[in-house]
Amino acid sequence: MGRVRNKKWIVRACAFWFCLASAQAAVELGIDVLKSQDYSLLKGKRVGLITNQTGADSDGTKTRLLLKQHCNLVALYTPEHGLDGTEKAGRYVKSRRDRATGVMAYSLYGPTRKPTPAMLRGVDVLVFDLQDIGCRSYTYISTMGRCMEAAGENKIPFVVLDRPNPVGGLRVEGPSVEPRWRSFVSEFPIPYVHGLTVGELARMVNGRHWTSVPCDLTVVQMHGWRRGMTWDDTGLRWIPSSPNIPRGTSPLYYIATGLVGELSGPEIGIPGPRPFQSIGARRVDPASFTRYLRGIDAPGVEFRPWREGSIGGSSLTISPDAPANLTGLGIYMLSELNRQTRPDLFRRTEGSKLDIFYKVCGGTFIRDQVREGIPPRTVVASWRPNEDEFRRTRAKYLLY
């Protein structure tokens, strides 16, 4: 009997490790493909790398360490949150020398958001390896765009080591950006959720002339990634991309509640162990708010009453493949919170913070629609022509 149990245990263990190995092999990142090609694309060139802690191969080895060992790495460039991803959102990052490589790490989230000619001196090729989250307001894609522009201006080739979009390649949601509201949190005229990998977006930025000067662009494609994959399907380990994106599912919650959290009044679980996974405000009744949310069409999303001190609202559980329009869900939550709050959320929010809200939204239209009492379903439906047009326009830039 003991032998039979041992055999069963061995079979189960083998099955477990086989499944684990299969999951790990599901997707090869751009950096993995570059490694398999013996870094031939970068050999004999002085390399500048735009990266942070998310720039790593599928085994977790940092891209900057790999390029230091196998190529001539001469400069690093870091986005919001810094080289280690620990700085708070919106906080300026200082340039410093990286202890791990001995290479200077120039901050692109300080006095400048774009590499200066001095920062690019002695660089033959710029390489981008950052993990994005698939949402327009997350600034890593803005950093990519500014670096592409600098590369074009200085006639430096630009290489993107591609990575998965953690919310998948099929989800396209939200309004575009009005020209006067383009900013570092809305750098490109794309929907709030774009469904592109960074490599595909780079191709679109170049092809649509969204920078002042196009660059000589190469995308090192992934192997094994498909548009229907969310992060959990890739078999890859998630490296927190910033302090409040600790898990591979965090981008889903960021999309749903992050926009509302730009206003004064709403609480979205920050600081805390579950950022973006709850939403509420003072004197909001958790039961009635949750009952309202359960009455809307949000397949794949569960709501539970949530209270913390005087804050009332709901906690969210979002399935990675939830069909619900998560940006639209944010409008429902914003509308109901605004209805239950006095004075309304927009009057509570001071000028500079309200300005950030408009920039994240891409204009003042969401404020206007909510204040006018336009039903959320009508607001969300008004986005569809833009979403459909974007799907058609982006098609020629897709790689997967």
Task: State where each predicted segment sits.
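Bacterial N-terminal signal peptides
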Residues: R12-A21
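Short internal beta-strands
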Residues: V74-H81, L161
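Glycine-rich, charge-decorated loop segments at or immediately adjacent to ligand/cofactor-binding or catalytic sites
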Residues: G85-G90, V159-W181
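Glycine-rich oxoanion-binding loops at beta->alpha junctions
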Residues: V93-V123, C135
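Glycine/threonine-rich flexible loop motifs
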Residues: D132-M144
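Conserved anion/nucleotide-ligand pocket segment
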Residues: R182-Y254
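Glycine-rich, aromatic-lined ligand/substrate-binding cores of catalytic
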Residues: W225-E302
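Conserved functional hotspot residues or short segments at active or partner-binding sites
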Residues: P275, I279-A381
